[in-house]
Curated annotation (Swiss-Prot):
This is L-lactate dehydrogenase. The keyword Zinc does not apply. Catalyzes the conversion of lactate to pyruvate. It comes from Priestia megaterium (Bacillus megaterium). The modification Phosphotyrosine is found at residue 226.
Length: 318
């Protein structure tokens, strides 16, 4: 099996056409990133309906071939994006989904690989860190070619809330959320900047994490999914846009730094766990994990998050 590959047709296979999968497909068409997009779902009628609906808007978008297919269509895909699985219910944590979705994923990944697929797999289903690890184990693909969406959405939420608070363009806010995509995630205050200026200069204190407004912003970030689920039942637009961003970094060989779920192998002193960290993403998947110089408290938070993920993973998947 190759450790590197050259994109062939810019073909993407989407497994799961629920809220996230269909939103991802719609976003892909609007941004014109791929040439081919195949929608795969156990409910073939649903996949067919989504493909037809999106195709009818093609005169307003960049030309792209979209159809409802089967796992055999993964054979020559550059990227397989998995959004299928049980959804997070109100009051349910992402980790509560483990047992249900591990079983689903074992079947999905085997079907993808049995097609002859030899590209990159991007996992979006929760708990994403654990399911990315399951995907890597079952697929046998090189570590860097199995990526979880990780904390890309949490980081985007964090940057948006900071930009709203300080009244600046969110594209000029540089700050990361690391760790589990879930309750043990944490903000990397020590590297938060606005326009190249450290965040502490905007609030006149070095103890950012103790500043009430900043703590509230992080809590809003961490708990955002719960608030959205309680109001509309599910989150899908934001994560779909995040998945498209990762897709673009892969297909366009961008070498972009994004907070994805990647397998740590000694980085940050942690091994054998997929977790949200900044990483360089290009046509081969994860090119390199960026090791930030964390404060002792931030390092402790990352280790705690990794420990929780390992414990939960080991109970559900060995």
């Amino acid at each position: 099996m190759k450790t590197q590959f050259t994109p062939k047709t810019r073909k993407v296979a989407v497994i799961g056409t629920g809220f996230v999968g269909s939103s991802y497909a719609f976003s892909m068409v609007n941004q014109g990133i791929a040439n081919e997009l195949v929608l795969i779902d156990m409910n073939k009628e649903k996949a067919e309906g989504e493909a037809r609906d999106i195709n009818h808007g093609m005169p307003f978008a960049t030309p792209m071939k979209i159809w409802a297919g089967d796992y055999k269509d993964c054979a020559d895909a550059d990227l397989a994006v998995i959004t299928a699985g049980a959804n997070q219910a109100p009051g349910e944590t992402r980790l509560d989904l483990v047992e249900k979705n591990v079983k689903i994923f074992e079947c999905i990944v085997k079907d993808i690989m049995n097609s002859g697929f030899d590209g990159i797999i991007l996992v979006a289903t929760n708990p994403v860190d654990i399911l990315a690890h399951v995907t890597q184990k079952v697929s046998g693909l090189p570590n860097g070619r199995v990526i979880g969406s990780g904390t890309i959405l949490d980081t985007a939420r964090f940057r948006y809330l900071l930009s709203d608070y300080f009244e600046v363009d969110s594209r000029n806010v540089h700050a990361y959320i690391m760790g589990e995509h879930g309750d043990t995630e944490f903000p990397v205050w020590s590297h938060a900047q606005i326009g190249g200026v450290k965040l502490e200069h905007f609030i006149n204190t070095a103890a950012i994490e103790k500043e009430p407004d900043m703590q509230h912003l992080f809590e809003q970030t961490r708990d955002a999914a719960y608030h959205i689920i309680n109001r509309k039942g599910a989150t899908y637009y934001g994560i779909a846009m995040g998945l498209v961003r990762i897709t673009k970094a892969i297909l366009d060989d961008e070498n972009s730094i994004l907070t994805v779920s990647a397998l740590l192998e000694g980085q940050y002193g942690i091994s054998d766990v997929y977790i949200g960290v900044p990483a360089i993403i290009n046509k081969n998947g994860v090119r390199q994990i960026i090791e930030l110089n964390l404060t002792p408290h931030e390092q402790q938070q990352l280790e705690h998050s990794a420990s929780i993920l390992k414990q939960t993973r080991d109970r559900a998947f060995v």
